[in-house]
Design a protein with these regions (language model features):
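Extracytoplasmic ligand-binding site segments that recognize negatively charged/polar headgroups
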Residues: 1-113, 117-120, 154
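Short secondary-structure boundary segments
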Residues: 45, 72, 128-129, 192
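Short, hydrophobic alpha-helical packing/hinge segments within bilobed ligand-binding/sensory domains
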Residues: 56, 112-113, 121, 131, ...
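Sec-exported extracytoplasmic/periplasmic mature domains
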Residues: 61-65, 87-88, 117, 121, ...
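Periplasmic-binding protein-like
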Residues: 96-99, 104-106, 140-166
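A ligand-binding cleft/hinge motif common to bilobed small-molecule-binding domains
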Residues: 123-143
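Mature extracytoplasmic/periplasmic domains
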Residues: 158-222
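Conserved C-terminal helix/tail region of periplasmic/extracytoplasmic solute-binding proteins
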Residues: 219-248
Length: 248
């Protein structure tokens, strides 16, 4: 990918957060252009009182049984990304217990937030940022919540690669160089509801807790080379936990 970055600013470390160009792999085939603190949980504030949930383990309380939704962790996406981080951080047994809480699992990210906004559930695990922001702006009583176990840095949909032997390679190169510009990143962050890794892109429309902070300690990065190499093993664990619960 290095050779197709035509604009000098794109290869300049000062353009990007942490003063470096972020790659998800040592061969520089995956460029990371969005990086943000993942909000592991979202709550409906009419159903969850302040302080009721401060830890992931609080979700195991019987009172939350049938009142939790989650983005499907058995496919690539936000639910799996969160599972991958925390299964390494707090262990597999927690997830077996959480599955027994009769959580509502869906692959429809908007549906999950709709359930939360309408009060069908009280808590959502791995909420979708874009849908959260839309419901919040519409007046839904939603808040993000970071448990005391900590949070991690995520790229979400914010990475790009050039596929070998794909049609229209020149158009793909042109798009990559545009999407990484300030204009391209401003459009991306406004439409997706997540920050850009560029330091010159506005963030005033985003929840402050989502923004990367230099003095914050994050427990993992879901775009690290280690995370990329661990995906297959973690996906197997996710299926081991959730397939029987989902009737597969």
């Amino acid at each position: 990918m290095d050779r197709i970055l035509l604009l000098p600013e794109l290869s300049n470390s000062e353009t990007w957060m942490r003063n470096k160009v972020e790659w998800a792999d040592k061969d520089h085939t995956v460029f990371v252009f969005s990086m943000y603190a993942r909000n592991p949980l979202a709550i409906n504030t009419t159903l969850v009182q302040k302080g009721e949930i401060s830890s992931l383990y609080d979700l195991l309380d019987p009172k939350w049984k049938g009142r939790i939704s989650m983005n499907d962790p058995t496919i690539q996406g936000g639910g799996f990304s969160l599972f991958q981080v925390y299964v390494r951080h707090i262990g597999i047994e927690y997830w077996h217990k959480l599955a027994k809480q009769e959580i509502l699992i869906s692959r429809d990210r908007r549906q999950i937030m709709d359930w939360l906004a309408k009060g069908k559930v009280a808590v959502t695990v791995a909420p979708n940022n874009e849908s959260f922001n839309q419901f919040k702006e519409a007046g839904a009583p939603l808040e993000f919540l970071t448990p005391r176990e900590g949070t991690y840095l995520s790229t979400g949909n914010g990475s790009v690669s050039l596929i070998n032997n794909a049609p229209h390679p020149n158009a793909a190169r042109l798009f990559i160089n545009w999407i990484l510009t300030r204009e391209g990143q401003t459009n991306f962050t406004k439409s997706m509801g997540v920050p850009s890794a560029r330091v010159d892109v506005p963030t005033s429309h985003l929840p402050p807790e989502m923004l990367w902070k230099a003095d914050e300690k994050y427990i993992a990065e879901d775009f690290s080379e280690e995370a990329m190499e661990d995906k297959t093993a973690s996906m197997k664990l996710a299926h081991d936990v959730f397939d029987s619960y989902l009737g597969r």
